[in-house]
Amino acid sequence: MVRKGDVARFTALGLVASMQPSHAIDDMRWADARLGPGRVDGAYAWRWFLDAGVHLAFGSDAPVEVVSPFYGVYAALTRQDEAGSPPGGWHPDQRLTLDETLRAHTAGAAYAAFDDRRLGILKPGLRADVTVVDRDLFRVDPPELLGTRVLMTIIDGASAYEAEE
């Protein structure tokens, strides 16, 4: 949790906001009751950080949470559990777009690891790390992301994994 007034300090100090989106849809079950509704306005405040120019870095926090990055992508897009609750999402003003979410999982994570000059985006001269999936993430509804299958993983330009048919 962060107070809205403290977000500018992240920008001024060049800090990274590193979070796991899946935590938001787990913590929403108890956060209001335990922490108070006014305090949780700044829980997983991705939009506040992004709008202030703070670097976001996302991960899965496996094995504590589900290892699939698509679960985290779904959480960042919807702020809802797998059943679609609550309607509209928990603190929906903090939801992100798919572009923003994927960037936080890739370029943002590389930046947080001080490795953004080597990986995190597809660009000549950087490592070619690619995940090929079974659907166009930009053309499916968020709940469909939960069933995404990895077909191939390429690390530094070489095939590291291929799904069996």
Model-derived features with residue positions:
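His/Asp/Glu-enriched, well-ordered alpha-helical/loop segment
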Residues: K4-F138, P143, T148, M152-D156
